[in-house]
Structures are given as structure tokens and as C-alpha cells.
Curated annotation (Swiss-Prot):
Alphabetically ordered keywords of this record: Cell outer membrane, Chaperone, Lipoprotein, Membrane, Palmitate, Protein transport, Signal, Transport
Family per record: Belongs to the LolB family.
Annotated function: Plays a critical role in the incorporation of lipoproteins in the outer membrane after they are released by the LolA protein.
The encoding gene: lolB
The protein, known as: Outer-membrane lipoprotein LolB
CDD domains associated with the record: LolB (cd16326)
Alphabetical list of InterPro entries matching this protein: LolA/LolB/LppX, OM_lipoprot_LolB
The organism of origin for this protein: Haemophilus influenzae (strain 86-028NP)
Amino acid sequence: MNNMKTFKFLTALFATAILTACTLDMERPTNVQYIDKTDAIWQQHLQKIQKIQSYQAKGQIGYISPTERFSSRFEWQYQNPKSYTLKLYSLISKSTLLIQMHQSGMTISDNNDNQQSAANAKLLLQEIIGMDVPLEHLAYWLKGQPAMNADYQVGTNHLLGAFTYHVDGSQWTADYLTYHSNNSMPENILLKNDSTKQTLKIRVDEWIY
């Protein structure tokens, strides 16, 4: 890639007013009631989502940090920790950004044939997009599966309600605001990291698994 500045185009081409779905309250919900983790219906659902090894999700995403603010449509395809893709579509242009994880690391490319690869996926995401989001964990967070060592809560709907998880010395929280009624998969998710002041609002419109 010849010009890193022309490639880092999210601010110019993706930046816009955060989509309506993501301008809903960015603060964590309060006065939420939870039930015991041993709930039989929750345990049955947990076993179901643990068996979903590969899947696709489509929807919209809004991201806010001290240095970046953008919203886009997204397509997420996950096979395993070394094979997944995240495609972002600008809401105000035809621009696209493709993030691909593979055996040798990560590649980020756009629809103008700009491309950058690196073995360190975390640093590449920060350099190109300005995001410090652990995509390897997002694969589980997106489908509402808490990590084994996560501090999580089960909602009165017998589904994952919220969790707290430490990654690279900082703390992420997630609140599962709504679920799809037809498959009990997450619909609206609020992810926050108060240490890095990042907020990620995700709306999943379609699940394929």
C-alpha cells in the first residue's frame, strides 16, 4: 500500500451521524433484573450457542471513541479464531472495508485496491481504523456466549443479560438489550470499555448458522 493516509478513510467516508439504531441511549441500562445462572432454560440455550461454531451475522454498527466516530452496515462471517471476515459498508458512499483474519495474521483492504497486512491483528486495527476492539472475543460476544471466566448475568428472558470481561488490562462490559424472537439470538448489543472510552452499538438484523 503506497499511502497509509489515503487508506485510513473511515473518518472521511464512514463518519456520519450515528445511525438511528445506534443513537439510542449509549449508557448502560439500570435497574435490570437478573436470574440465577443455573436456570435450566438458560443452560439449555447456552449449550445451543456453544455448538454454533461457524456463523454469519448482518446488521449495523455504530462506534465511538475519543478519536473516531463512524457507523456502517456490516457483514460478519466466522469459521474459527484464525478464519473470519468483517466487511463494513459506508452509509454515505459506496466505500467498503474488508477485514480478513487468516493463518498468517490480518489483512485490511478497501474497494480502491488499497491493502495492508500484518501478523499483529490488534496493532493493524488500531493503525488503519483506530479501533481497539478484540475481534477474537467479539466472535463469542456477538452470539451471546459468555467466556468461561467472565462475570455474567442472565436476564429474566432466560438469555444472556450482561457481562464484564477483562482483555489486555482493560475491562469490557456488554449489555444485551433485545433478542430476536424467532431464534433467541442477540439483536441489539451495547459494548463499552470505560478505560479506553470506546462504545460499540451493534444491531444484528440477520443470523445465518
